[in-house]
Swiss-Prot record:
Species for this entry: Jannaschia sp. (strain CCS1)
Protein name: Glutamate--tRNA ligase 2
Binding of ATP, residues: 251
InterPro entries: aa-tRNA-synth_I_cd-bd (IPR045462), aa-tRNA-synth_I_codon-bd_sub2 (IPR020751), aa-tRNA-synth_I_CS (IPR001412), aa_tRNA-synth_I_cd-bd_sf (IPR008925), Glu-tRNA-ligase_bac/mito (IPR004527), Glu/Gln-tRNA-synth (IPR000924), Glu/Gln-tRNA-synth_Ib_cat-dom (IPR020058), GluQ/Sye (IPR049940)
Pfam families in alphabetical order: Anticodon_2 (PF19269), tRNA-synt_1c (PF00749)
Compartments, as annotated in UniProt: Cytoplasm
GO molecular function: ATP binding; glutamate-tRNA ligase activity; tRNA binding
């Protein structure tokens, strides 16, 4: 039985993506939970690339996974590749054969499908019938000659498999209701189920957190570990993400790749803060660092219900990150835009409260540097032209706006919103934004129509 999770300096967790595609928000949830558990316990976090599929695994995807993790600040203590460990998987397979827990089977997919349909028609669970165990040596040789190598299945003990899950609580699965899992394909490819078992036990992994779609996998893997004379780690299974209305998220995951969110302007801490709390009893709050996130992280706050995810919830958090960012943290970016050093701090104070994404910093500097395209309603055109004719030449300071609007008010009789809004829109090309006194003192060109 798997023990419940507890904090310990010997905690070892892992995130084990397959380099067959880009990471998406569903992957991130698993990665983040395992990272935070290790971080909080002062333990070890392993990035393990499950690259046993040579046809689909690529170095480009492996690199992309690491780039996404680095962008988010989810640093790993060591990296492992399953493609470097085939000798260990072969040794484990040999050990299972020696213990009569591994057997070869030759059914075709069509034959297996027919068996499943017959079982369902008879109201029986669609479980592999272990027909291969009844084959004689001569029959095996004949099948091998006809069909080549078969698949290798692990022979489950037909008893209940029980463990205390870190999120779902006490679980019990009847092994008789589960098919003996295929661990090695006919082409020799080692599958996830055994590779993960060997890696987790060899690497001393103490805590495994993954999606609830792995619960049956966990049951079979516990038996495989026991057959190999190993102890099972603590398991926890988090709920799966759905769309905002509870719809399946799987079809949308391609548009929720981490690299796409990064390119769209998402701030890492906004994404991490959201993903660390949704689906829990704790409110989503913007954290200042991964250390702060780890300190407040506890699997006991999570439940089994599907977790709704809406990417739109991330943008207010991203804006909050930027609003709270100190000048020192963006000084290099601002200097690269060409903002003069003497006004750079003042520019950031004005810009940061009025941006939702980092890319918008450049938009504000373009406005101050080059001027805006005026936004003028037809009924205000004559008024704005008169006001602009009264605008003094550069340089401007914090009194320019009040002095100018006072003069315009006296000359035109306009006041309040009818005075200020048309001038704001004409100077900035926007209906909303910073205090106009701050805008004017940062202008590098005289506004014109």
């Amino acid at each position: 039985m798997s023990a419940p999770m507890s904090a310990s300096t010997s905690v070892v967790t892992r995130f084990a993506p397959s380099p067959t595609g880009f990471l998406h928000v569903g992957n991130l949830r698993t990665a983040l939970f395992n990272f935070l558990i290790a971080k909080k316990a002062g333990g070890e976090f392993i990035l393990r690339l499950d690259d046993t599929d040579p046809e689909r695994s690529t170095q480009a995807f492996a690199d992309a996974i690491q780039e996404d993790m680095e962008w988010l600040g989810l640093t790993w203590d060591r990296i492992e590749r399953q493609s470097d460990r085939f000798d260990r998987y072969a040794a484990a397979a040999d050990e299972l054969r020696a213990k009569n827990r591994f057997y070869e089977a030759w059914e075709t997919p069509t034959e297996l499908d027919l068996k499943r349909k017959k079982q369902l028609n008879m109201h029986q669970p669609p479980v592999y019938d272990r027909a291969a165990l009844a084959l004689t040596d001569d029959q095996k040789e004949a099948l091998r000659a006809e069909r080549g190598q078969g698949v290798w299945r692990f022979k489950l003990d037909h008893q209940r498999i029980e463990w205390t899950d870190g999120i779902l609580g006490d679980l019990s699965i009847d092994a008789a209701s589960v098919s003996d899992p295929v661990l090695i394909r006919a082409d020799g490819q080692v599958l996830y189920t055994i590779a993960s078992v060997v890696d987790d036990t060899d690497m001393g992994v103490t805590h495994v957190v993954r999606g609830s779609d792995h619960v049956t996998n966990t049951a079979t893997q516990i038996q495989i570990m026991e057959a190999l004379g190993k102890s099972a780690p603590s398991f926890a299974h988090h709920s799966l993400l759905t769309g905002p209305q509870g719809e399946a998220l799987s079809k949308r995951l391609g548009t929720l790749a981490l690299r796409d969110l990064r390119e769209a302007g998402m701030e890492p801490m906004a994404l991490l803060s959201h993903m660390a709390r949704i689906g829990s009893s704790q409110p989503v709050e913007l954290a200042g660092s991964v250390e702060e996130l780890a300190e407040g992280f506890d699997l006991n706050h999570f439940g089994s219900a599907p977790t709704k995810f809406d990417v739109e919830d991330l943008w207010p958090l991203t804006a909050s990150v930027l609003h709270g960012t100190a000048f020192e943290d963006v000084a290099g970016e601002i200097a690269a835009l060409g903002v003069p050093a003497d006004i750079a701090p003042a520019f950031w104070e004005v810009a940061r409260a009025n941006i939702g994404k980092r890319a918008e910093i450049a938009d504000w500097w373009a406005l101050f540097r080059d001027g805006a395209t005026p936004l003028v309603a037809d009924e205000d055109r004559e008024f704005v032209a008169q006001a602009f004719a009264m605008l003094p030449d550069l340089p401007y300071d914090e009194t320019t706006w009040s002095n100018w609007t006072s003069a315009v008010k006296e000359a035109t009789g306009r006041k309040g919103k009818g005075l200020f809004m048309p001038l704001r829109k004409a100077v900035t090309g926007r209906e909303r934004g910073p205090e106009m006194a701050d805008v004017m003192r940062l202008m590098q060109v005289k506004p014109t129509l």
